[in-house]
Amino acid sequence: LIRQNVKTLAAAVREGREIVVPGPTCSYMLKQEYPWLDGSDDARLVASHTRDLFEYLMRLHADGKLDTNFSKRPGKVAYHLPCHLKAQNLGTKSADLLRLIPGSEVEVIERCSGVDGTWGLKKEYYKISLKVAEPLFKDVPAARPDRVASDCPLAALQIAQGTGAAPRHPIQIVADAYGVTPE
């Protein structure tokens, strides 16, 4: 599967495309693991043209190409920084973009969700994963947010289970701020 993905994605890069990925674990895999697992020049090409979604959007902003005409305000957002974004040394690009929305206040929460890939979802580790995530479960409601966000869907699931909040991907909050409604 890796070789087929690399072949397909490398062809897209050669056509002038960038690979933009909304999931931090997936972008980490393409950037860091594919070159190591596949070892080919194509895998390195794919890695060098892969961007996390908010890494890409903030680059557009830096180049003056991102529309920042937001029509709705998200209020206070408790933003969970996923471990696979930290591992990519990207900083807090999602939080940075959310802060561009007028009237937003973003509190970054750097706590472990206890999921660790799918480890924390396995029956034998689930209770341990919840224990690991207890500091996160305390920090989210303590932030008194209007909204909760995480780029990582598994971390969002864990946050929902541990806090009762309904985390959303930051791009959903950005879409709301643009006034884009789901169909």
Residue spans for each PLM region:
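Iron-sulfur cluster-binding electron-transfer modules in prokaryotic oxidoreductases
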Residues: 1-183
